[in-house]
Amino acid sequence: PTDERSLGAENYDGEGLATRRNDLIVSGSLNTFLHNSYTARRLGVISTGSAVRGVRSRPGVGMHAMQILPGDKTREELIRNVQNGIFVRGVNGLHSGVNPVSGDFSVGAYGHRIVEGSLGEPFREATIASTVQRMLLDIVEVGGDFEFLPGGTGMSSLVIAEIALSGS
């Protein structure tokens, strides 16, 4: 949350506590939960500096400048290792296609097919669906092409073993 390269970087959370790095997943296992003062007090732990709030709302729990740390391979190397798949260049409908309680998502996607390790024909108006939990479990590899996205989160290319696909 304090990475100055991110538009989402903040020194203090929505309750005025210092933000800090929280490693949520380490070596494929859940490492910690995020907390504001209220949730921390309820569970008898220390706040992780993760309070977020709107102008008229009470502080909730959320992330500031979330990042998936980069791996070693280039995007091209990741694609070369996929025999049959899709390369998603972008998604539509994140604001309405994700259930924040269950983790279910179904969003529009566009990109290219991957055939025998090379980018093939483009596709658009496809739908990808899964759960956030399943997608995290199905990550095979993380690319070294880290970049910040609008809103302050940071991301690298991911190779995901399975995801439901429908459409063109």
Predicted segments — roles?
Residues 1-168:
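N-terminal small-residue-enriched
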